[in-house]
Swiss-Prot record:
<keyword id="KW-0808">Transferase</keyword>
<dbReference type="InterPro" id="IPR050118">
    <property type="entry name" value="Pur/Pyrimidine_PRTase"/>
</dbReference>
<dbReference type="InterPro" id="IPR029057">
    <property type="entry name" value="PRTase-like"/>
</dbReference>
<protein>
    <recommendedName>
        <fullName>HGPRTase-like protein 2</fullName>
        <ecNumber>2.4.2.-</ecNumber>
    </recommendedName>
</protein>
<dbReference type="GO" id="GO:0016740">
    <property type="term" value="F:transferase activity"/>
</dbReference>
<comment type="function">
    <text>May catalyze a purine salvage reaction, the substrate is unknown.</text>
</comment>
<dbReference type="GO" id="GO:0006166">
    <property type="term" value="P:purine ribonucleoside salvage"/>
</dbReference>
<keyword id="KW-0660">Purine salvage</keyword>
<dbReference type="InterPro" id="IPR000836">
    <property type="entry name" value="PRibTrfase_dom"/>
</dbReference>
<comment type="similarity">
    <text>Belongs to the purine/pyrimidine phosphoribosyltransferase family. Archaeal HPRT subfamily.</text>
</comment>
<dbReference type="Pfam" id="PF00156">
    <property type="entry name" value="Pribosyltran"/>
</dbReference>
<dbReference type="InterPro" id="IPR026597">
    <property type="entry name" value="HGPRTase-like"/>
</dbReference>
């Protein structure tokens, strides 16, 4: 986790209407994502996650690169939860709200009985993951594991659900600085 920890010290923090937003290669693709950092993170996810699943599920946009690399390494199929509808049969919509945005997302190709691993870049306010978990649960999928690369320490909307996420690193962002816990 050396590269991940090192990358946090170089990551800019911007203010989004009073919310300290970490701009990081894993969570934003900016600054440029070094392949060694992505590889380190994916190897760590593989060692952390329960991979006895039918599908890897990741939200658009910044979960995609992690889940793609993980899918390539594990040969587990990947489902992307999209930000726009396609109107396909069985498509399920969900409403997600974070500390800085609100939108609809759409799930395709997850069915009752599917065993899924959810992978995402960041757990901050928890709005996205809480909405995804609730929707997958409503579909009847079994959420076997949830792994995020970074988790901001503090309350999150995921706390109000029956689901727990494992993080590779827990952080705080305060006064423009990132602290690893």
């Amino acid at each position: 986790m050396e590269k991940l920890i090192e990358s946090l010290s170089d990551a800019p923090i911007i203010d989004k209407d009073g919310y300290e937003y970490l701009v990081h290669p894993i969570s934003n693709g900016v600054p440029m994502l070094d392949p060694d950092l992505l590889r380190e993170v994916v190897v760590e996810v593989m060692q952390t996650a329960d991979l006895d699943v039918d599908k890897i599920v990741a939200p658009e946009a910044m979960g995609i690169h992690l889940a793609t690399a993980l899918s390539l390494q594990t040969d587990i199929p990947l489902v992307v939860i999209r930000k726009r509808p396609y109107g396909l049969e069985g498509e399920v919509s969900l409403h997600q709200q974070t500390g800085y945005s609100e939108s609809e997302m759409y799930i395709n190709d997850v069915e009752e009985g599917d065993r899924v691993l959810i992978v995402d870049d960041m757990l901050s306010t928890g709005g996205t993951l809480a909405a995804i978990c609730t929707a997958l649960d409503d579909i009847g999928a079994e959420i076997v594991d949830i792994v995020v690369v970074l988790r901001k320490v503090g309350d999150s909307a995921l706390d109000d659900t029956k689901f727990d996420a494992t993080s590779l690193l827990d952080i705080t962002v305060e006064d423009g600085d990132v602290t690893v816990h």
